[in-house]
């Protein structure tokens, strides 16, 4: 019997974010959640819960991590396992919000492709910047509609501080992060893993903020171990 698994994408990502990992997980029944319709993290979480099986394992990357933490807040009894990849329990700083607003202004001016290209050095390990992974990430981000991107940024900026809540998580938990993640550095994953009882921290070598595409073998291996807990 296949294990239900809900996978939540990050900002300006679609199901492609998870495709290489899904191909390596042969004991799951994966569903990639839709996070394109809501402008709040709580709204995204509620929509996912309405469509999800009664009980399921749950993984989110980056913005997806903010959403899965909200799902745990709303319905902890429905989740069997929790994975937090390249994400952060802290709220945005005012400096980070200002940077987001500047990017949003560029998108409103029709410069989505420029924003995508400028963002790649923060998303990928240096070794992955010249090659098929970088091109695939760029194509994925511009595939996501500008209106979706703007809604998601609004949701991210308004997210709560999840740090006080981490100690209450009572699930088999994987915290994973690319060793070269510049956008959400590994120290923030270490912080979460230390706060969640029994959490396992896995660092993916030669990967930045998107290890599901940069290091899918390592991510799938960690997730198989996690799902077997």
Regions found by a protein language model. Name each.
Residues 60-64, 68:
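Gly/Ala-rich beta-loop-alpha elbow adjacent to hydrolase catalytic centers
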Residues 73-74, 78-117:
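Flexible "cap/lid" loop of the alpha/beta hydrolase fold
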Residues 92-95, 110-168:
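Conserved alpha/beta-hydrolase catalytic His-Asp/Glu region
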Residues 169, 175-177, 181:
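Short beta-strand/loop motif that positions the catalytic acidic residue
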Residues 171, 185-194:
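Short alpha-helix in the alpha/beta-hydrolase fold that links the catalytic acid
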Residues 190-209:
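Catalytic histidine neighborhood in serine/cysteine hydrolases
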Residues 207-220:
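Catalytic histidine-centered segment of alpha/beta-hydrolase-like enzymes
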């Amino acid at each position: 019997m296949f294990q239900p698994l809900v996978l939540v994408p990050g900002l300006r990502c679609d199901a492609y974010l998870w495709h290489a990992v899904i191909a390596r997980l042969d004991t799951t029944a994966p569903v990639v959640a839709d996070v394109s319709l809501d402008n709040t993290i709580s709204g995204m979480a509620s929509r996912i819960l309405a469509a999800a099986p009664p009980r399921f394992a749950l993984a989110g990357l980056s913005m997806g991590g903010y959403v899965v933490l909200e799902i745990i807040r709303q319905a902890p009894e429905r989740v069997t396992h929790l994975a937090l990849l390249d994400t952060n329990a802290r709220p945005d700083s005012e400096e980070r919000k200002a940077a987001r607003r500047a990017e949003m202004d560029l998108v409103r001016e029709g410069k989505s492709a420029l924003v995508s290209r400028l963002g790649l050095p923060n998303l990928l390990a240096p070794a992955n910047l010249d090659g098929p992974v970088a091109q695939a990430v760029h194509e994925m981000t511009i595939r996501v509609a500008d209106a979706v991107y703007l809604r998601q940024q609004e949701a991210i900026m308004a997210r709560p501080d999840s740090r006080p809540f981490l100690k209450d998580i009572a699930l088999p938990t994987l915290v994973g992060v690319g060793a070269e993640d510049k956008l959400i550095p590994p120290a923030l994953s270490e912080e979460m893993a230390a706060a969640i009882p029994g959490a396992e921290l896995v660092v993916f070598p030669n990967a930045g903020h998107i290890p599901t595409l940069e290091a899918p073998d390592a991510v799938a291996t960690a997730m198989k171990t996690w799902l077997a807990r």
